[in-house]
Every structure is written in C-alpha cells, then in structure tokens.
Amino acid sequence: NEYNGWTNWETWVVNLWMDNDQELYDHYGKMARVKVSKDKRSASYKLSLAIQEQVDDWMPHLDNSLYLDLLNGAMREVNWIEIARHILDRIEDEDSYIKEAN
C-alpha cells in the first residue's frame, strides 16, 4: 500500500499537512532539535511519540460512530516513526546547509 514513497496514504497525508503548514513545520522542527541525541533511533522514537500524542489531542471528540471507527482506523495506520525520521532528516539537511553557507 505504499503511496508517493511513504508507507501508506495515511502517513503521507499526515506528513503533507505538517509540511504545508508553516507553523507546524517550524514547531516540529524545533521539537526534533530538542529530541535529537547521539542515538538517532532514540530521537526518532521519542519524537514519533510526541507527534502522535499531539495529533491525538487534536482529534475531535466524537461519540461512538462509524466516523469515529474510520478515523481511529486511519490513525492506527500512520507510521509515526517514518514521519519522525523525515523531520530529523530535514533538520539535519537544513543544519548542513546553514553550516555550508557560513
């Protein structure tokens, strides 16, 4: 079910929203820099949990319904680690670009 180079459509669309919203883009970039440690795997895991918790907090509170079941099903499909790694790679690229420019 790969989609546009991502694990699946759900992961792609969550990342698309994060990348296309400047406030979210900056927020998760700052969060990633805080989470980065010597072990990138640990940073990916910690960042993925933080992102998932925030997105879960933003979900609308719905009564039990077909829509809630569909929303929960889609959220379970998101590969949060993949999104976290993408953000970490992005900030690494940005930092390298800044170093080279100076």
Where are these regions (language model features)?
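Acidic interaction surfaces
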Residues: N1-N102
